[in-house]
Amino acid sequence: MAIYSQVPWTLPRYKFEVKVHPLAATSNLQPDDGYKIELRAENTVDKYPAKQHARRVAAQIRQGLGLIFLMGQKSTLHEDSDQERSLRQRRYFFYLSGVDEADCDLTYDIKTDKLTLYVPDFDLRRAIWMGPTLERKAALRKFDVDEVNYHSALDEDVKKWAKNQDTGSTIYLLHGSQGPAENPPNVTIDSKALKLAMDACRVIKDEHEIQLIRRANDISAAAHLEILRGIKSMSNESHIEGSFLNTSVSLGAHKQAYQIIAASGSNAATLHYSKNNEPLKGRQFVCLDAGAEWNCYASDVTRTFPITHQWPSIEAKQIYQLVQEMQESCIALVKEGVRYLDLHFLAHSILIKGFLTLGIFKGGTLDEVKKSGASLLFFPHGLGHHIGLEVHDVSPQSIMAQGINDDSNNILILPTCVSPCTTSSPALISGMVITIEPGIYFSQLALDNAKPEQLKYIDMARVKNYMAVGGVRIEDDILVTKTGYENLTKVPKGDDMLEIIRQGKKGNDSPCVDRPTW
């Protein structure tokens, strides 16, 4: 049976129809088969729902009155240079505006339900050199706001608002340093409640946000497929990075959600390897962790693959299949109400059972090995994280919170485990988008610093046979639903992946995605 999925969605100005399918009539790919992603666009109007977001945040604050004040990212120069830094919009500002332009601010009057955007005043010299900035009428048409004023009116508007408020009214700031030029004397400044309220809202994605993440994933899928098709002609990690960037930009994604990781051989044992400059010759696997960004929303996709269309060694195949089992078993259990941490524990249990079978672990039961923490030497990070405006997106608690031991499972949760992979994280809720990204890594540094209670269960002679594997990670972006999940990542794995590599590029396969006509 041919694999076929059709996903229509709406983005600002365009409606896209996406089809991801192998061009085959049966489940077995044939030499002339291939994966193709089709993107078709038609004009529509669908603004980013900034006003809806503002109302949700205000409801979370629960104070009834007050003014939300948010500053956007300012234009800045590189140190000791006249060259501007690339804009990366402040994500909290974007959530309440949908504006990906520099030097803008906003206010939201909770009582009157009025969302006001402030755009830069016209600057003739800058317009001649850089092009015009946002004009008020154009901004009002483009963004989901009630009013647009020039930035020069901001301070006076805040003063006017304060004069009409009772003493003790509140201005809500994200940070104490990001407020009005002068704090009105009759109002209270609160720099704590707003972030907590926005984090609680951002963790549950609305339909518009889901479609943006879906779009980012489809562009990433196209880029990953292009690399699988061309990997046999690549000789350096830099070629992989360059190919991913080329496909992403050609499809309109000019920014990456994070720095590309194109790690071959033992480099894949470094979780966030980023040099991407070493030759591929003699390496067994490449671990490619790369995700495009679309309209400030991230994708996060990892695939591990050989340089050729065959498993490079029996050890490489064993580890890949074990990681794939870890991932597929965890994804299958995702639904509302599930505790994500239990999926993390499940992944460790599958790893331990697999290592006991392979002889990498020895001399203990599953529970004994688990209690020792030996599996953490090979799987040292959390199973995944939230994804949205940030690749490691926010949650109701700080994503940098210190981890805690869970005595019921005897698995140490490291500080690198972030929400929802902590003991204090709430159960999964419909509308969350999470990653499931188990990995197995053979890091000499980790093994050299292992504790005696961990080494007790490790057959180091056996481990040596696997060191050349480097590292294997497989990662998908998963939308939580009330009854299950939707996998937003459409990149082949396992044998399907090997078949794509074997087929290589044919004819006009580059790029492997039909560019939308916008």
From Swiss-Prot:
SUPFAM superfamilies: Creatinase/aminopeptidase (SSF55920), Creatinase/prolidase N-terminal domain (SSF53092). It comes from the Eukaryota. Pfam families: AMP_N, Peptidase_M24. Its EC number is 3.4.11.9. Its cofactor is Mn(2+). It catalyses: Release of any N-terminal amino acid, including proline, that is linked to proline, even from a dipeptide or tripeptide. Binds 2 manganese ions per subunit. Mn(2+) 2 binds at residues 289, 300, 475. One of its GO terms (molecular function) is metalloaminopeptidase activity. Mn(2+) 1 binds at residues 300, 437, 475. It is an enzyme of class 3 (hydrolase). Signal peptide: none annotated. One of its GO terms (biological process) is proteolysis. Keywords: Aminopeptidase, Hydrolase, Manganese, Metal-binding, Metalloprotease, Protease. PANTHER family: XAA-PRO AMINOPEPTIDASE 3, XAA-PRO AMINOPEPTIDASE AN0832-RELATED. Belongs to the peptidase M24B family. Catalyzes the removal of a penultimate prolyl residue from the N-termini of peptides. This is Probable Xaa-Pro aminopeptidase HCDG_07916. It comes from Ajellomyces capsulatus (strain H143).
